[in-house]
Amino acid sequence: MSKLTETFTNIFKIQELRERLFFTTLLLIIVRIGSHITVPGVDAVLLADTIKKSSENTLFGLYDLFVGGAFSHAAIFALGIMPYISASIVIQLLGAVVPYFAKLQKEGEEGRKKITQYTRYGTVAISLMQATGVVAKLMSTTTSGIPIVPEAVRGFGFYLSTTIILTTGTMFMMWLGEQITERGIGNGISLIIFIGIVARFPNALLDEFQLVRGGTRNLIVELVILVLMGFIVAGVVLITQGTRRIPVQYAKRVVGRKVYGGVTQYIPLRVNTAGVMPIIFAQSIMFVPQIIFSFFPNSEFMNELSTNWFGYSSWTYSFVYALMIIFFTYFYTAIAFNPKDVADNMKKQGGFIPGIRPGTHTSEFVDNILTKITLPGSIALAAIAILPTMMIKMGVTPGFASFFGGTSLLIVVGVALDTLQQVESHLLMRHYDGFMKSGKLRGRR
């Protein structure tokens, strides 16, 4: 404990680190304030009541969970940062199939600037599309027969202004994220998502203890649930950090009077190379049917499909969701990690895996190991993703159940590890002790 206290004390001794932390905190506070500023014309009380009654099993409930509660407040940041994430994914996928984008990814700083610009354009386009869908859903939603958008303000003016406000809100959040990345600590976009998720935890925990106070749940059962949550978080940390290391030997080279090489290094292959991306891919696709159903609010057939077949708590949803996560884990791993490039770079630098011939044989060896460790990683990822649904079926409140797994827990754990790793790097660079004695706290990368 004294070690941890000393580390936090050291953080505030470094002026640059102190300023970066203050700047990051300030911008995250702005994000939270924007998540509570209501869009003009929407009855936020009725909207929050609608989402609460839905038990987070509808499109509204799922979306609100992902944007940190901004949607339930009908806030200007209701779209969250997800349009930017979606645009980034699309650009990354284009880099794997379109030569122009593949070339940009290899052009260093200039290529990165162009990719960033294309990502911004994509964010605007996706934000506009999502905003129009959200406004349409808002205008068609009622609570006890009362519309959440009053008749007096409905019309093209409301539709256009709200679409612009929501799109602008996302672009402003994107700018805040970029500022945090450049002038603060950690990845700004990730931290914005992180703070939105964590901000919901106190209320979710309070809802759980309200059940205990009301006599609905036994205190011992609640304590067991909390202990179980601790084990699940520990398991997610292990999966996030789990690595298979492949030894690489470098031949000795004599340059002048100096001898280079002759050392053993390692290729770290993560059990979960794809990170949270497979869940985001699968979740995005599973949202599509719900979006389609939302345009037919009066159709009994569509409502039946939406609730019993594609509803968040249905077994069909969980089964299809898990299969898609396993598929996308392999798919994204193949895009994010290229064994051939690793083998070629190793060969150029005079490195080799003991017992394996350089070149094609090395590529096949690495690919074989990656395929083997990806299977348990993908199954574990699918299990983590559907855990919240299972916990809801066991009686845990929907808000608290979201912290048992899924995208929320993976993002919280991953971003926390990455940010702590950056803080530790600043400490070690200035000869202070880090969070761990070995100074080897690893992020996700």
Give residue ranges: language-model regions.
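N-terminal cationic and glycine-rich segments that engage phosphates or anionic surfaces
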Residues: M1-Q105, E109-R445
